[in-house]
């Protein structure tokens, strides 16, 4: 335990908080190029084929990002926008691809929660 005099001279250092999305380098989003589009299986007890993409960001880092929503148009060399946000049942997937931005189309026929999937407001039905 330090003495008061030692604390006056040196002070205490507070540990720096590490970001959960380090590859973005303190930016809200980053642009990137899809290197590979694949499916991954989640941890127990879940079962599915989750769609993910390996993306090389503009800062040179390679990350694995989740493609949300039903169906997508991504393939190799697609330009995508990547945001932070992990997928709890996919180990190593700490990023999301933004739907409706750059080459990634929004989810069509989406009625609720449209803003999260880049879906436009549907036209009102004719009376």
Swiss-Prot record:
Function: With S4 and S5 plays an important role in translational accuracy. Interacts with and stabilizes bases of the 16S rRNA that are involved in tRNA selection in the A site and with the mRNA backbone. Located at the interface of the 30S and 50S subunits, it traverses the body of the 30S subunit contacting proteins on the other side and probably holding the rRNA structure together. The combined cluster of proteins S8, S12 and S17 appears to hold together the shoulder and platform of the 30S subunit.
HAMAP family: Ribosomal_uS12_B
UniProt-listed SUPFAM superfamilies: Nucleic acid-binding proteins
Keywords: Methylation, Ribonucleoprotein, Ribosomal protein, RNA-binding, rRNA-binding, tRNA-binding
Single GO MF descriptor: structural constituent of ribosome
PROSITE patterns referenced in this protein's UniProt entry, alphabetically: RIBOSOMAL_S12
Protein name per Swiss-Prot or TrEMBL: Small ribosomal subunit protein uS12
Assembly and binders: Part of the 30S ribosomal subunit. Contacts proteins S8 and S17. May interact with IF1 in the 30S initiation complex.
């Amino acid at each position: 335990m330090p003495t008061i005099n030692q604390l006056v001279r040196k002070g205490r250092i507070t540990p720096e908080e590490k970001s959960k999305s380090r590859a973005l380098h303190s930016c809200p989003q980053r642009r990137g190029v899809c290197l590979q589009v694949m499916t991954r299986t989640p941890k127990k007890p879940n079962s599915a084929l989750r769609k993910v993409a390996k993306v090389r960001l503009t800062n040179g880092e390679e990350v694995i990002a989740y493609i949300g929503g039903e169906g997508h148009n991504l393939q190799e060399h697609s330009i995508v926008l990547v945001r932070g946000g992990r997928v709890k049942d996919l180990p190593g997937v700490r990023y999301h691809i933004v739907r409706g931005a750059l080459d990634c189309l929004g989810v069509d026929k989406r009625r609720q929660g449209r803003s999260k999937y880049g879906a436009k407001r549907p036209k009102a039905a004719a009376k």
